[in-house]
């Protein structure tokens, strides 16, 4: 895989000398190879760390576990050297080879180099990130599977010494697998939650790519122009996040906001729930803020779905008196209030979340209407700390 990357990345349009993102091009891959040739022992040590990271993620002990796994494999081969049954166990050796090669690729490209992209080349301790685990988890499992096969084979051949030795190695590997499960269970859950939040955030950014600042687009790719180009194609083909039957309301035709408010669109996380948002700070009860979407076609059986919340930073009781969220529909010259909800998470803990709502739009089916979002301060007309957010307002059918 490394050499496929190396060959492909040396050809247009992948090859790029862009100094802002030099990690994947021909010249950089040459640096990775040179580092491996000049520092082979350091790279081997990092490879053992990758093996050990299948059991534990501790900088101080990961190398010891890597040495242990490698030593067990060498002992397994030595004990069964006269009866390896390579043809019979080929699939496990193939998987083992794949796991070892992908681990080596990771070590070569991410464990330090002479250009210092990923730290100094003299590294002897290396922990791969969790996102790389799908490509490095195989060696320990394959070695354990081989130990079971050789243990069974030695029992069939009635070799007492081999049987005892293979059983001992099998027990050691099984113990390592149990330790791996125990040590990585809760960190794995935490990492899964982090990845879920990260993917939700990126999904929200992708859905609204054409209004997102370059800083957010760089979370998808370091070149924002590439994001815009590819996202537009996905949108045209209705693929990925654009495949859903909905109209996301995120590009208003008219706004009247608090003069000091500089941000309209954004991405907000409340607990582990991330949404694209419209920020609408109330002005006053006499001068409502508005966000207007004109000429929105309403399909059959359509519903307006959205979430409302105040930013978690203003949930303290002394910060304001809540916000009223309202939605109006303007149709054929008539304006109708179809939704109104007052929330005050500062004093009502049950509202410290995304509060989900929907409005039935079936009576407007087949027509173009104007949808107006509005916010008002609380009953005391106190607009301080009223950081009001509409979460992913959309029409679904």
UniProtKB/Swiss-Prot annotation:
Subcellular location per the Swiss-Prot or TrEMBL entry: Cell membrane
Superkingdom, taxonomy of origin: Archaea
Topology with respect to the bilayer: Multi-pass membrane protein
Keyword Cell membrane: yes
Keyword Membrane tagged: yes
A single cellular component GO annotation: plasma membrane
Coiled coil region boundaries: none
Sorted UniProt keywords: Cell membrane, Membrane, Transmembrane, Transmembrane helix
Transmembrane region(s): 62-79, 92-109, 135-154, 167-189
Major site of localization recorded for this protein: membrane
Protein name in the entry: Uncharacterized protein AF_0303
Organism listed in the record: Archaeoglobus fulgidus (strain ATCC 49558 / DSM 4304 / JCM 9628 / NBRC 100126 / VC-16)
